[in-house]
Regions:
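Hydrophobic h-region of N-terminal signal peptides that target proteins for export
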Residues: 12-21
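Structured extracytoplasmic
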Residues: 21-181, 188-195, 199-217, 223-233, ...
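Bacterial N-terminal signal peptides that target proteins for export
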Residues: 1-11
Length: 274
């Protein structure tokens, strides 16, 4: 019995030693940089986004469920979004034809762009993309990180990292980041965000105080790796309460991303199967 017990103890020390040798802040810094490259590379792909919103009353009972299905394309370096379904049903034939005409027009306009015009649009898209992801670059300074262990997710090893606000952080987005904590999972081999589960530890306001998020609200996301190595969103959501102006909203919303493929200039809207 002594040798097996000793082996277990030695194995435990090896695991702890392996974890302590990893700096979670460094892991996060690398992951943020990789995420920026992923987001940039996504512009050569088209994919579908389903949006499900479940609205509840003050007692938590469901009042209404709304769903949409859209396709996202990049035309001439600029994102283009058009609808496919609403509330589980294909668009009426008239609306489908209208959306196809709009897509054909946008595709034709993109094909006539000069190199300078295309480059300018790409630069504008890149500027907006950097703005959308800007907050991520402040994560290493805004939080204290704890390496909690490893997990296997989708047959790949991932670090599990606890995230807590750094008490003395007063930098950009501090008004938001100081009110969120949770757990991040990072792919070990490629330093990519695999998933996140974040909670509001305090209520906070956003958008010049025009909107606020209630304490206890939850934000989550999951990413997946495509066969060519690109990491993309799989699903993301919000659960909780918010206030917009004087209106209180209680809802769960989830976005699901699917059917990633290289964009073809002859893309046409194909009615989704009922």
């Amino acid at each position: 019995m002594v040798r097996p017990l000793r082996n277990v103890i030695l194995w435990s020390f090896c695991i702890v030693g392996g974890l302590s040798a990893q700096d979670p802040r460094t892991i996060i810094e690398k992951t943020v940089n990789h995420d920026r490259r992923n987001y940039r590379d996504l512009q050569s792909w088209t994919y579908k986004v389903s949006d499900r919103i479940e609205k509840s009353d003050s007692s938590g009972r469901t009042k209404a469920i709304e769903t949409t299905l859209d396709e996202v394309l990049y035309l001439g370096g600029k994102p283009y979004i058009h609808p496919l379904r609403k509330n589980g049903k294909p668009l009426p034939a008239k609306d489908t034809a209208k959306e196809q005409a709009k897509l054909d027009k946008a595709t034709a306009e993109a094909s006539r762009l000069s190199e300078d015009e295309r480059r300018k649009r790409e630069q504008q898209t890149e500027k907006q993309r950097e703005k959308d992801r800007e907050m991520l670059q402040y994560l290493p300074d805004a939080y204290n990180f704890t390496l909690l262990g490893e997990e296997i997710i989708n047959s790949r090893a991932a670090w599990r990292i606890g995230v807590e606000p750094a008490p003395h952080y007063n930098g950009k987005y501090g008004f938001l980041l100081k009110n969120l904590e949770g757990t991040l999972w990072i792919d070990k081999d490629e330093n990519q965000f695999v998933k996140g589960d974040i909670h509001a530890i305090k209520g906070f306001s956003i958008g010049l105080f025009l909107a606020s998020i209630a304490e206890g609200s939850r934000l989550y996301f999951e990413n997946v790796r495509l066969s060519d190595g690109l990491w993309v969103s799989h699903r993301a959501g919000f659960e909780g309460s918010a206030r917009v102006l004087i209106r209180h909203i209680r809802q769960n919303e989830e976005l699901q991303f699917s059917e990633f493929r290289k964009f073809q200039t002859d893309s046409r809207i194909v009615p989704a199967e009922p």
